[in-house]
Amino acid sequence: MHWLRKVQGLCTLWGTQMSSRTLYINSRQLVSLQWGHQEVPAKFNFASDVLDHWADMEKAGKRLPSPALWWVNGKGKELMWNFRELSENSQQAANILSGACGLQRGDRVAVMLPRVPEWWLVILGCIRAGLIFMPGTIQMKSTDILYRLQMSKAKAIVAGDEVIQEVDTVASECPSLRIKLLVSEKSCDGWLNFKKLLNEASTTHHCVETGSQEASAIYFTSGTSGLPKMAEHSYSSLGLKAKMDAGWTGLQASDIMWTISDTGWILNILGSLLESWTLGACTFVHLLPKFDPLVILKTLSSYPIKSMMGAPIVYRMLLQQDLSSYKFPHLQNCLAGGESLLPETLENWRAQTGLDIREFYGQTETGLTCMVSKTMKIKPGYMGTAASCYDVQVIDDKGNVLPPGTEGDIGIRVKPIRPIGIFSGYVENPDKTAANIRGDFWLLGDRGIKDEDGYFQFMGRADDIINSSGYRIGPSEVENALMKHPAVVETAVISSPDPVRGEVVKAFVILASQFLSHDPEQLTKELQQHVKSVTAPYKYPRKIEFVLNLPKTVTGKIQRTKLRDKEWKMSGKARAQ
């Protein structure tokens, strides 16, 4: 069996010595994880080696058949599958993809579905069949879809009613696209119906023995700078990395976890598939067609959800409601990542619910990189320490590790040996992949500070840093200060050209409704004074522009690049790099 083969490689980890941890991958094999090394099997497949393990435990009566997936649509319809049912259903999905669709190992499959159970089946089906899945949000328009299908040379797309027209508008311009698979109650010309095929498919599928380093997924980066790139992950960088990080959330096998994320974002697979099912826990999913804080609060009150994971904006939106009307009897773990968690969000959530929010940090390319685990002290404004498989450091422009308390670029050590968890590279873009290496480190493109305890503070995207009169100013510092003022609902801070200082801080501000009638000039002065009062005065925004919305990626991240490029273009000047 491939699990008994000699280990193919070692992944060196750097840092303080920690005791050995042993985690079950399945009943046939133990993987010993130590701070000094990791044993990496030659073959690994999350579906057969993790999911089917829990299914076998259920069949053998060694595990209660509790839900693995619990889905609700908010209108009274619910669905529950235990691990045996999930295993069989995903084998049906694999048979559809490799049988009815005729897809071959290594083919690329775009997946654009809302939060429906079929999303999880299709992803698992791809994993079983050795196909490369490429999740995308249903918010994409035809131009976004065309770019992704052409760039990836996808052989198939699995989509729902929400994007049929958008896909059909551009499908003829995608010569590689052969299969269109529709997840819907209705049929559509040119599309195979997934639900119909699922009813006819066999529940037995021979899982492909995939290599640990074999390509498993492609995620298009969010494009906060430039066009989205194709970040390729392997079976080990997703599945095995999840085994190594398992438990940081505090999740137990008997628990229920709700990850509030768009299905096109990597957070969705990390939280709602890899983390929960690695531990044998239940993934809770709400269809949630649109973000509605009242629906989220009602759901938390009505279902035995123990852990909730989402972006900080989820908590900020919930805090705008009257939380005194809701009780969360089961909720214990609140996790936030994807953007900076403002200290006041943490404080307000704790004050109103009695619960802490534990922050985590990562990227499409690296997965979970830093986190505040269940046993760690929470430091407001800090995103935790390095994940167990990574040596994360703050480095200078030559790749030297900087001492604690010094701002620099955040990097993960990838030499002399590349750690598990790092993506394989940008597809067909080796120059861009190589450009992100500085010395022995992979650059995350973020600025930060590491303190004496190993906690990291996020200072901003490296290309977002503002250099004004010799002062280097991180936009998140100014944004955090502005968000403490009741007039500010959302803000984005960029550099703006200045004839004397080179560049100055400019803030784009979305106002709360009750402040829309205020005098703009007076409110500008008030906000500037406010920033001076809560942070170093040199950071205050010398320019403020009130706007109704901010440019964002399809995953909801503010695109400071667009604001900055427009600002500098209007001035007719080029920004110094």
From Swiss-Prot:
ATP binds at residues 221-229, 359-364, 446, 461, 557. Optimum pH is 8.8. Its EC number is 6.2.1.2, 6.2.1.25. Residues 1-46 form a transit peptide. It catalyses: a medium-chain fatty acid + ATP + CoA = a medium-chain fatty acyl-CoA + AMP + diphosphate; benzoate + ATP + CoA = benzoyl-CoA + AMP + diphosphate; hexanoate + ATP + CoA = hexanoyl-CoA + AMP + diphosphate; butanoate + ATP + CoA = butanoyl-CoA + AMP + diphosphate. Activated by monovalent cations, such as potassium, rubidium or ammonium. Pfam families: AMP-binding (PF00501), AMP-binding_C (PF13193). One of its GO terms (cellular component) is mitochondrial matrix. Its cofactor is Mg(2+); Mn(2+). The modification Phosphoserine is found at residue 513. One of its GO terms (biological process) is xenobiotic metabolic process. Detected in liver. The keyword Methyltransferase does not apply. GO terms for molecular function: ATP binding; benzoate-CoA ligase activity; CoA-ligase activity; decanoate-CoA ligase activity; fatty acid ligase activity; fatty-acyl-CoA synthase activity; metal ion binding. Keywords: ATP-binding, Fatty acid metabolism, Ligase, Lipid metabolism, Magnesium, Metal-binding, Mitochondrion, Nucleotide-binding, Phosphoprotein, Transit peptide. It comes from the Eukaryota. Substrate binds at residues 364, 472. The keyword ATP-binding applies. Monomer. Belongs to the ATP-dependent AMP-binding enzyme family. Catalyzes the activation of fatty acids by CoA to produce an acyl-CoA, the first step in fatty acid metabolism. Capable of activating medium-chain fatty acids (e.g. butyric (C4) to decanoic (C10) acids), and certain carboxylate-containing xenobiotics, e.g. benzoate. This is Acyl-coenzyme A synthetase ACSM2B, mitochondrial. It comes from Homo sapiens (Human). The lineage of its organism: Eukaryota, Metazoa, Chordata, Craniata, Vertebrata. The gene is ACSM2B.
